[in-house]
Design a protein with these regions (language model features):
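Phosphate/diphosphate-binding loops
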Residues: 1
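Surface-exposed interaction regions enriched in Ser/Thr/Asp/Glu
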Residues: 247-255
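Catalytic core of carbohydrate-active enzymes
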Residues: 5-15, 20-238, 245-246
Length: 255
């Protein structure tokens, strides 16, 4: 698996959506879409490029969801490439097992399908049919549901609603997620403006992981002062307010 390979020293892997060499009779639209969304929140993936394993082969609803998730993948490119740069510096894989990421939380080690994508996102792949999934969020930290914006305390197993248009991904409190603009292909990327928006999971504490990172976070008197967010949309967590002053952004508790 990607997590085992990553733990063996190979930081980035690629996997194909579906299995081109096996009987596709069991490939339902739900299974295909869950597989695709798992690929979107992985280090790298590819379509098989064969009849019967492309998004339009599974109906209009699946195709519509697939388009949405592919837009998400393009928006994640700055973060994923930043995680790859981080791997080159630290040796940590882009997809990090729970045991590797949370060595002091023995319960986390039992959840061997969940993983961190980079340092900021916890991904819980949906591996069974249905619209709910059980997720363990590691103790000692808080986690923000990317689908709903709800904040969860760690150290507990939660049952999360997960419709076909949703996927269980959680932002790690204290981190930021830097997103690029939506695109149809990488040729539309503007190398001079790779970022479009920043999502904050609680009060920012850590410098974000993002390609060519020039964003810096400094804490002072209960607030975070951030440089490098000029021209970007900022989506703070509930209870925080944003104030811009020249090239600096101040994040503080709402009064």
């Amino acid at each position: 698996t990607a997590l085992s390979i990553g733990a063996s020293g190979l930081p980035v892997q690629v996997h194909g959506i579906g299995s081109a060499t096996r009987d596709r009779a069991g490939m339902t639209p739900e299974l295909y879409l869950r597989w695709l969304t798992a690929g979107v929140f992985s280090s790298n993936f590819a379509f098989q490029g064969v009849d019967g394993l492309m998004p339009w082969d599974f109906g209009e609803e699946t195709l519509a969801h697939a388009k949405t998730w592919m837009q998400w993948r393009y928006r994640l490119v700055p973060y994923v490439l930043g995680a790859i740069e981080d791997s080159a510096r630290t040796g940590l894989p882009v997809q990090r097992s729970m045991a590797m990421s949370f060595p002091n939380d023995p319960h986390a080690h039992d959840w061997d399908l969940q993983y961190l994508l980079g340092p900021a996102l916890l991904v819980a792949p949906v591996t069974e049919p249905g619209k709910q999934v059980r997720v363990y969020l590691p103790k000692g930290e808080a986690w923000w549901d990317l689908n709903t914006g709800h904040r969860y305390e760690g150290g507990t197993t939660w049952t999360i609603d997960c419709e076909l248009g949703q996927f269980p991904v959680f932002g790690r409190e204290g981190h930021m997620l830097c997103l690029g603009p939506a695109a149809q292909h990488t040729g539309e990327f503007n190398s001079a403006r790779i970022l479009d928006e920043v999502w904050m999971f609680g009060m920012p504490v850590h410098n974000p992981v993002v390609m060519r990172n020039k964003i810096r976070v400094m804490q002072m008197q209960g607030s975070s002062y951030i440089k490098g967010l000029e021209g970007l949309r900022i989506s703070p967590s509930e209870g925080l307010e944003v104030k811009r002053r020249g090239a600096e952004v101040r994040i503080s508790r709402a009064r």
